[in-house]
Amino acid sequence: MPGPLRVLITGAAGQIAYNLSNMVANGNLFGKDQQIILHLLDIPEAKTVLDGVVMELQDCAFTVLAGIVPTHCLKEAFTDIDVALMVGAMPRKQGMERRDLLSSNVKIFKEQGEALDKYAKKTVKVLVVGNPANTNCLIMSKYAPSIPKENFTALTRLDHNRAIYQVAAKAGVPNTCVKNVCIWGNHSNKQFPDLSHAVVTKDGKQHPAKELINDEKWVKEVFIPCVQNRGAAVIGLRKLSRAASAAKAIVDQMRDWWFGTKEGEWVSMSVYSTGDHYGAPKDIYFSFPVTIKDGHYKVVDGLSMDEWSRSLFNLSADELVDEREVALASFK
């Protein structure tokens, strides 16, 4: 067996992390031959709950879990980690504006970015989940300048998975028969879920998803709003944020980043925008379709976009630029 990987999960006493830590410790992410040491970070006030999480992980007797480091200390949490799954963030409370949430959370991610820069391995792969994920990811990367911006991504796989399910259900096929949906832009209700280039395998043949579904009204009035607002819909029914689906998406995104995508398939990931792809603004974390090989992602270029699609793309891009400016202004 290779040496153990040190995997940090922040917000470790929360519901997403409760699901996620079990998936990682069970080998769902890095495989059954890779030993894991889990670093579990949360605030001191969550210590009792975190102790309970640790007890459950111990009681599972996972074969790949080589150690657990529960802590509220940033140095202990970030030292020598290989992977950071940044789940923890301040939740949006009643009466709180998006601007308030941004201001609170970017300060958390500034502090954690500084700790990452100081203590983590320079090869660390960072996946930001806590919202607003794209802008938190940008701030964290800015305060960890010794780590390449390509080593940071924000979670878009949950939106990607939601889109796959909706297309599969509409087409009457299993989820495994849908590939190459796109999520463009922000992880917010201004994201652009796009099935213009998606492919559905049905009756042994591959079909363009839009041609097979052949229902533009459904695409614009059902599919896109459903994916954009799915998180809020789950909260409305459960009275709790999505947890299991988010944990599964985190594992999916990091596993593909670690091991690579299948030939002929892409996935959606929020990555650093250099300004060279589809006219997306520079210096934001923006969701693109990507292929991945040997731990390195590559944006899929050359996909066509009509005028209506471009307007949705630009709407999400504008929101991310606005978020960036609000976030950076909070440090002045």
Curated annotation (Swiss-Prot):
Q: Name one GO biological process term.
A: tricarboxylic acid cycle
Q: Which residues bind substrate?
A: 92, 98, 131, 162
Q: What's the domain of life for this entry?
A: Eukaryota
GO MF assignments? L-malate dehydrogenase (NAD+) activity
SUPFAM superfamilies referenced in this protein's UniProt entry, alphabetically: LDH C-terminal domain-like, NAD(P)-binding Rossmann-fold domains
Cellular location of this protein? Cytoplasm
Q: Which top EC class applies here? A: oxidoreductase
Give yes or no: UniProt keyword Oxidoreductase: yes
Q: What is its main location?
A: cytoplasm
Q: Which InterPro entries match?
A: L-lactate/malate_DH, Lactate/malate_DH_C, Lactate/malate_DH_N, Lactate_DH/Glyco_Ohase_4_C, Malate_DH_AS, Malate_DH_NAD-dep_euk, Malate_DH_type2, NAD(P)-bd_dom_sf
Q: Which reaction does it catalyse?
A: (S)-malate + NAD(+) = oxaloacetate + NADH + H(+)
| Keyword set, alphabetical order | Cytoplasm, NAD, Oxidoreductase, Tricarboxylic acid cycle
Cite the active-site annotation.
Answer: 187
| Enzyme nomenclature, EC number | 1.1.1.37
Q: Which amino acid positions bind NAD(+), per UniProt?
A: 11-17, 105, 112, 129-131
Quaternary structure and interacting proteins, as annotated: Homodimer.
- Protein name in the entry: Malate dehydrogenase, cytoplasmic
Q: Which organism is it from?
A: Echinococcus granulosus
**Upper taxonomic classification of the species?**
Eukaryota, Metazoa, Spiralia, Lophotrochozoa, Platyhelminthes
